[in-house]
């Protein structure tokens, strides 16, 4: 692993390994040995991890992963870290170990006292943000609210501007097939999404920015990948994650919007079945670290 002397010019990037029985330790090690990380950061592995059998998660490995998250968020809130990158965890094991959150996104938001947050994923030419996240598909329609679409859309605009998109172009995906076909295939577009898009358009101060939608979900991601849009605002979890992973499976990054510090993670799981076999790829972890460094450099402190 590379070690850098801490100084004022280096951004301090805390990295958790996730569940140490998975590929987390392996991909972090590969990433820190890679020439694809900038030298403008100090990379700090956070947490204490037990000896374990690779591929065999236990409650002990889950508790260690949870404790590492607690340490990382505490140090970031104390301004001891400029950004946090989290390794993959096994949610079922985490729940058994007492973890009370749907995912790491919700954990960081609660620990930071943040209500206005969102899940965003980026990879290749596609960036998506999710209006609803970890809920059953049959609850999505009831959970969609105009103010939530506007709230997440504004966070997405801020994120894109932070990444130097001065005039972001955002597509808003419809919920139903063909964006509802003028109400024939569902009323959510007419009653919820269209008013939210209009409100977003009026809230964006830069007239060169574009908020367009609701657009048919079956073509909007192709249009984004072709460069027509900088991001897609999605109504539910798999609407955004399926095209992103199809387009950029090995480079996808999860980033939590709205936190007081950058938090990213690779967009994949623990992969217990290949842990320790020397076949795990670190591309997504490398991308997550690079994005954390980029955002840390642009971070505005209160």
Regions flagged by a language model, labelled:
Residues 97, 111, 140:
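Residues that scaffold the ATP/ADP-binding catalytic core of kinase and kinase-like folds
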Residues 118-120, 234:
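Short, hydrophobic/aromatic-rich beta-strand segments within well-structured domains
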Residues 107, 119, 128-130, 263:
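Conserved hydrophobic/aromatic beta-strand scaffold that supports enzyme active sites
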Residues 116, 124-127, 249, 268:
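A generic structural signal for well-ordered coil/turn residues at beta-strand boundaries
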Residues 121-151:
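Ligand-binding beta-strand-loop-alpha-helix segment within the catalytic cores
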Residues 105-115:
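A glycine-rich helix N-cap at a beta->alpha junction
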Residues 1-105, 145-201, 208-235, 239-264, ...:
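Contiguous, glycine/small-aliphatic-enriched amphipathic segments in soluble metabolic enzymes
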């Amino acid at each position: 692993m590379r070690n850098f002397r801490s100084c004022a010019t280096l951004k301090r990037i805390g990295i958790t390994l996730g569940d140490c029985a998975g590929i987390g330790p392996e991909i972090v090690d590969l990433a820190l040995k890679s020439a694809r990380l900038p030298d403008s950061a100090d990379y700090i592995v956070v947490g204490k991890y037990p000896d374990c059998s690779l591929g065999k998660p236990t409650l002990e490995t889950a508790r260690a992963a949870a404790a590492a998250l607690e340490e990382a968020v505490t140090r970031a809130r104390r301004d001891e870290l400029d950004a946090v990158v989290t390794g993959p965890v096994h949610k079922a094991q985490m729940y058994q170990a007492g973890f009370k959150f749907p995912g790491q996104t919700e954990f960081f938001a609660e620990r930071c006292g943040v209500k206005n947050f969102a899940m965003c994923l980026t990879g290749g030419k596609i960036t998506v943000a999710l209006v609803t996240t970890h809920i059953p598909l049959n609850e999505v329609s009831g959970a969609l609210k105009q103010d939530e679409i506007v709230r997440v859309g504004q966070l997405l605009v801020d994120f894109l501007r932070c990444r130097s998109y001065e005039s972001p172009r955002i597509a808003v995906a419809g919920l139903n097939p063909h964006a509802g076909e003028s109400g024939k295939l569902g009323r959510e577009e007419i009653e919820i999404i269209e008013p939210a898009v209009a409100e977003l358009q009026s809230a964006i101060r830069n007239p060169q920015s574009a908020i367009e939608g609701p657009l048919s979900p079956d073509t909007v991601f192709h249009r984004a990948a072709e460069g027509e849009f900088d991001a897609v605002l999605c109504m539910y979890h798999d609407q955004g994650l399926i095209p992103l992973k199809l387009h950029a499976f090995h480079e996808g990054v999860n980033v939590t919007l709205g936190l007081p510090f950058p938090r990213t993670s690779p967009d994949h799981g623990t992969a217990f079945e290949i842990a320790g076999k020397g076949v795990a790829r670190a591309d997504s972890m490398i991308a997550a670290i690079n994005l954390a460094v980029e955002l840390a450099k642009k971070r505005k402190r209160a």
